[in-house]
């Protein structure tokens, strides 16, 4: 039986002591971790990856996240992701991020993020022209 797609994952509890604190965000085999800061009102992604899969962990801010499974020709779905949220993007899933606030996040990828490798695996789309996406962004402007 095929596993159902899971978008959002739980982050571990914060452990505190006199030295400070620690929190497990994610276990896994990753080829890269990118730290990204995006300004309110900006758009990132707007593409899909042929093979790469990645997790996003939001340190601070909010992302209005749009996603659609290309293999199943599914409808576009929307989810508001907030501080401390962890979510997954599989290969072949169109995705776009609209930042409703200034946002600081980490992207954990299964493939190398050299520009050459990244561009070779990437297919650009134009999700901001989808009617549902336009309507959702308009509500946040």
Model-flagged regions — what are they?
Residues 22, 46, 65-66, 89, ...:
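Short beta-strand His + acidic residue motifs that chelate non-heme Fe in jelly-roll/DSBH
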Residues 12-46:
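A short glycine-rich, His/Asp/Glu-containing loop-to-beta-strand
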Residues 51-69:
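Glycine- and acidic-residue-biased ligand/ion/polar-headgroup-sensing regions
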Residues 38-41, 83-84, 90-92, 102:
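Tight coil/turn sites that cap or link beta-strands
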Residues 71, 100-141:
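Double-stranded beta-helix
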Residues 1-17:
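N-terminal leader/capping segments at the start of a protein or of a new domain
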Residues 47, 53-58, 79, 86-87, ...:
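His/acidic/aromatic-lined binding-pocket segments of jelly-roll/cupin-type domains
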Residues 70-91:
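Short acidic-glycine-tyrosine-enriched beta hairpin
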